[in-house]
Amino acid sequence: MMGNNWENFLKNLGEWQGSFTQISLQGELLDSIPSILNLEGFENNELVRFRLRRFGEGGYSQPPLSDYSQEYRFLGKQVIFFDTGAFSKGSLQLAPFSEFGAESGFVAENRRLRFVQLYDPQGSLSSIILIREFRANTDARERPPLTVKQLLGQWEGIAYTVYADWQPSETCATHIEVKDIGDDRLKQELSFGDRTLTSTARIEGDILHFEDGPISRKILLLPDGASSNTPLQLKLRQSFFVEVGWLVDDNERQRLIRSYNEKGEWISSTHVIEHRVG
């Protein structure tokens, strides 16, 4: 049973120190901007004040380059918070000649990891941003960069899906097996509910290219145990999803999936929590 959206949002309260890092489309780290995010509850947590400060090269010892605040008493339809505090937000509709974007966020004790995926008006992936955050005054640490080897094996978990039209949320068991089949290729078999999907990827360093489906996809393996799974090109009248993963520890991986139908309408968000079983 999932808690309500606001209660799950409150699991993000606190002061989070971190950075916004621009990632190239090939997974290279570019500019990084130090940040402090405060989420503070008032009026018995019926009001939440959001404050984001971004800093220059001098870091926290210098005045912020930007300081943005906003107050929330309710959340918009486009954002879903799950029981762990993880969230999925983004565009409600893929429209012609318009930018499209999604943000995913995970919470694990004194850590948060957020990720932004942006597409230009022509539907091409244009910008990806990795946001690594640590609760202030804790010894929270960054995870190692994600590798193919860390993904290999069998994983079992539960997928929690919330629908945009507010039909009842669903849970289903998941099983995923990832094998190295040689020649710089891997095979992935994913089962959820009564469906099984099999795909193969070409390994190019820290990039996995999935090219055998209706939409070519690329998974970037990134610092802090993160991964970004995106279509290379968004097309009208073709359903799609964007996904972000986080290897919370060696034996637990979480994924956030935001799905759109062939009309370009956002239809659901899914949070998957998987544990290594082999």
Locate the predicted segments by residue:
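Soluble ligand-binding/transfer domains with enclosed cavities or grooves
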Residues: N5-F9, F20-G278
